[in-house]
Amino acid sequence: MGELLSFQIFINEPVELLNLSLNAKAVLPEAAVLMAMLGTLLVDLAGEKISARWSPPICYAGLGSALILLAMQWDGEIQESFLGAFIADNLAIAFRGVIVLSTLISLLISWRYADQNGSPIGEFAAILLAATLGAMLLCGSTDLVSVFVSLETLSVASYLLSGYLKRDSRSSEAALKYLLVGSAAAAVFLYGASLLYGISGSTNLKEIGTTLLSAPTPLSALALVFVLSTVAFKIAAVPFHQWTPDVYEGSPTPVVAFLSVGSKAAGFALAIRILVGCFSAFDTQWKLLFTVLAVLSMSLGNVVALAQKSMKRMLAYSSIGQAGFVMIGLVCGTEDGFAAMVLYMAAYLFMNLGAFACIILFSIRTGSDQISDYAGLYQKDPLITLGLSLCLLSLGGIPPMLGFFGKIYLFFAGWADGQYLLVTVGLVTSVISIYYYISVIKMMVVTEPKEASDVVKAYPSIEWSIPGMSSLKVALIFCVLVTAIGGIISNPLFNFADSAVNGTPLLREAITLASKSSIG
């Protein structure tokens, strides 16, 4: 009888363990993206024509479902999955929402681009959805194993996307550089993770953090350096930025659009999970290191952008500077600081993807990426001129654009926390960035008709009836409208950012500890 009871317990325990590890509620948005990815692969097997017809609606359905499921999780009961290796708190939901929306807009602006370059649409969409899946899982990962698996899913898919234009040598070069540097970053992370596991005997970030608090060692500091290097690589912070300009210039433009927002959002989510949740014992040290990275990123990114001739390279260095601005919120470690990070990433999503939509449209019509070729564009294409101008002004932080409110919130949080150096550098470099943004606008608008570039003089007639152009137009207008009027009606975004912080136990604990230490 006792043996029978033991056997029943043995049978029941794995079932309970399986139910715990496969808590589907937490990962339903990821499941929707996964189903869309599998669907695009299946229709791709049926041939290019069927794939071109059905891949877009399948992607829209999957990503739209993911957004709805994320909205249903918002402010609800916090769910965990994969034996606690993934958590769906408000912070994870917010960053996953940014990533899904960035993928949706990237796909809207990519159909015509992929068709014109002769790239299979189904394969492209499936790989982009795989990268999205990895980025979403990374936002909620609370275990070193899940962090690494998610990170590599995102990275490998990104390498494939970067080299997707097989006939373009620059695309192949970008993929190779990205692969080599990314592999080195992954190896560095694994070494840091092995040190953390050796010190704590656990792969759970919270348990590692508890161990480091009770007994910090020199090896822990070394692990911090290795892990922080990987995080800095993912967000393209100086001096781990060398891959960014070449990859941005050589990769397909829709891929660059996704990497500049989706991949960066996942990187900042990873930074919060690991640095705040795992290295609270080294709070002063990692904040000092991030202060240095932020100053270098804001300074070098915006100064070097002044000398760029390619629009994509200019936005590459601009994105490095923008990462420096977001790091101000992370260094603060306050409620306003974390909320400002979330708000700015949401604002950056629209203004940056709006700019890339304009660049793609110009590239489709002219085949050019050179800034000088935009001279006199207002005469032939007022839509691109207006859209690109508004998005660049928002990136520069000009009121009343959405970017101004995001930037002012970051600077306010930094000043309130005593980060005077970061705020001062941020203000100075923002002025520098305004110069090169307005230089592009001036070239498009002020140039006399006779001084227009040869590319603009030979500008083709605008035809929106071509397949893939209508979705590009919708994405462009949507991003530009949100960028232009989002600042005027920014209260929902402020509430969204505050809820993301208040609905995340990890951040609430960090804020409480920070306030106690400041009082002490």
From Swiss-Prot:
Keywords: Membrane, NAD, NADP, Plastoquinone, Quinone, Thylakoid, Translocase, Transmembrane, Transmembrane helix, Transport. One of its GO terms (cellular component) is plasma membrane-derived thylakoid membrane. It comes from the Bacteria. The gene is ndhB. It comes from Prochlorococcus marinus (strain NATL2A). This is NAD(P)H-quinone oxidoreductase subunit 2. It is an enzyme of class 7 (translocase). GO terms for molecular function: NADH dehydrogenase (ubiquinone) activity; quinone binding. NDH-1 shuttles electrons from an unknown electron donor, via FMN and iron-sulfur (Fe-S) centers, to quinones in the respiratory and/or the photosynthetic chain. The immediate electron acceptor for the enzyme in this species is believed to be plastoquinone. Couples the redox reaction to proton translocation, and thus conserves the redox energy in a proton gradient. Cyanobacterial NDH-1 also plays a role in inorganic carbon-concentration. The lineage of its organism: Bacteria, Bacillati, Cyanobacteriota, Cyanophyceae, Synechococcales. Its EC number is 7.1.1.-. Belongs to the complex I subunit 2 family. It is found in: Cellular thylakoid membrane. It catalyses: a plastoquinone + NADH + (n+1) H(+)(in) = a plastoquinol + NAD(+) + n H(+)(out); a plastoquinone + NADPH + (n+1) H(+)(in) = a plastoquinol + NADP(+) + n H(+)(out). Its main location: membrane. The keyword Transmembrane helix applies. NDH-1 can be composed of about 15 different subunits; different subcomplexes with different compositions have been identified which probably have different functions. One of its GO terms (biological process) is photosynthesis, light reaction. The chain crosses the membrane at residues 26-46, 54-74, 91-111, 120-140, 144-164, 179-199, 220-240, 252-272, 288-308, 314-334, 342-362, 386-406, 421-441, 474-494. Pfam families: Proton_antipo_M. It is a multi-pass membrane protein.
